[in-house]
A protein has these predicted regions:
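Glycine-rich phosphate-binding loop of actin/hexokinase-like ATP-binding domains
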Residues: 1-28
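Generic structural signal for well-ordered, non-membrane alpha-helical segments
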Residues: 15-16, 20, 32, 66, ...
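Glycine-rich phosphate-binding loops at beta-strand->alpha-helix junctions
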Residues: 92-110, 114
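Alpha/propeptide regions of enzymes that mature by internal proteolysis
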Residues: 68, 114-118
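Glycine-rich phosphate-binding/hydrolytic loop that grips phosphoryl groups
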Residues: 124
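Oxyanion-binding "anion nests"
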Residues: 19-51
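Adenine-nucleotide phosphate-binding core of ATP-dependent small-molecule kinases
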Residues: 37, 44-48, 54-87
Length: 124
């Protein structure tokens, strides 16, 4: 997370990191208050999946939109983790927290498989 919860990884209803020009376009098209509502309450996994903000529900749904939302989340998790591992010049462990981190075993496994290059392995 950066200045606000809108930065960083995509969340249930928050966009995560987004190009500043996209925000300017949203403001031009929708106004400031509506844009704030869109980015904070109608984006993230909810917007990507077409209506589901909870990873548990996404994992139970076989739709292409839900699969895309999960793939997007895993991809950006890998990008963030990779940049942090590089900045720290390695790592000793990864701890998953929060609802997704604690309960979404499949999502954790997908992310960790993508970090095998850094010596990461799944330890359940």
């Amino acid at each position: 997370m950066g200045y606000s919860p809108l930065d960083g990884l995509t969340m249930g209803t928050r966009s995560g990191g987004i190009d500043a020009n996209a925000v300017l376009r949203l403001v031009a098209d929708n106004g400031l208050e509506r844009t704030k509502a869109i980015l904070n309450h109608e984006s993230g996994l909810l917007g990507l999946s077409g209506g589901k903000s909870d990873m548990r529900n996404l994992m139970l749904d076989a739709s292409a939109d839900s699969a895309f939302a999960i793939e997007h989340f895993c991809y950006w998790s890998l990008r963030h983790a990779g940049s942090l591992i590089a900045a720290m010049e390695g790592l000793d462990a990864i701890a998953f927290t929060g609802g997704i981190g604690e309960n979404a075993i499949g999502v954790r496994a997908r992310i960790l498989r993508g970090l095998e290059w850094a010596g990461v392995r799944l330890d359940v």
